[in-house]
Amino acid sequence: TPGYEFVVREKLSHLIFHLYRAYEKEIDSGDSELDSDSLRMQKMLDYIENHFHENLDLSQIARAADIGERECLRCFKRVIQNSPMQYLLKYRVTQGAAMLLRSPASSVSEIAGQCGFNSSSNFSQMFGRFFQCTPREYRKRNKKAEDDG
């Protein structure tokens, strides 16, 4: 299925983050770097998940955890091996894929806007990069799979 690898990678990123949090609890290190990274990441990921549809920039994500932009970048790299903006882009595309299937009456353009993309062509381009098909093809294939199953 197109995009399967992307979805698996996204799920693995979340799993790695949660394992990281479990590990830092086990070592009981008080005010360690792991504790602060975990807390910061949770704040920044929550912010992204609640505001992904808005026009976000690095400074807004960093402010969510009360840190500077450089520390935000370092924290993301340490914990999920991705930049905040790469994570945001993947999150937007993943949400768009879910919306395509959940809201068949919504146009690709409407969904692009709801996911924070400034144009449907930009959304389609990014979607293709992650899912190796257009949003319309993705919707059609998944509808066919649903009808066949």
What spans do the regions from the language model cover?
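Flexible coil/turn residues that form the inter-helical turn or adjacent wing/linker of helix-turn-helix
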Residues: T1, E54, P104-S106, G116
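Short, charged helix-to-loop "capping" segments that act as catalytic/coupling loops
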Residues: A98-I111, S119
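Basic/polar phosphate-binding segments, predominantly the helix-turn-helix DNA-binding elements
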Residues: Y47-H51, N55-T94, A112-E137, R141
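Juxtamembrane/interface motifs at transmembrane-helix termini
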Residues: I27-S29, S109, A145-E146
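Generic C-terminal helix-cap and adjacent flexible tail
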Residues: K140-G149
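Short, Lys/Arg-enriched, Trp-marked, Pro/Gly-tolerant hinge/linker segments that flank
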Residues: T1-E54, S59-A65, R78-Q86, K90
